[in-house]
């Protein structure tokens, strides 16, 4: 879309990839333009031409050395588990439906064991991973709601399917 809008080859670099079925909020990306453009016009154009399931909330000009992936401070995954007796058909694409009672206190205890720097190779969906599988989890928060349990994983990065497997 940017190449079509600007008439120049534009490579977009995201701060990370998402697994299939994962929705990203606050995903950061960067790109370089040879000629400066009005950020408001770029933002309007992007939201006009991008697929309907992608929206750009803001666009900011930054230093040319900025790299969205290598300068990300942390990333947070939210994993939602629907625990109600009746499936939520409206949220089915966004939550995991699990109607067996869960022990939230034990989940919190187990989460504490995962904090810190560890080799998460056993929790990676890609068995042929060539890069380091060592990651640091800074926080795991388990929140209980009326018919849903939300798990928030904050770390320096995540492996393919790591959060889904940990959950």
Predicted feature locations:
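Structured-RNA-binding interfaces characteristic of tRNA pseudouridine synthases
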Residues: 1-167
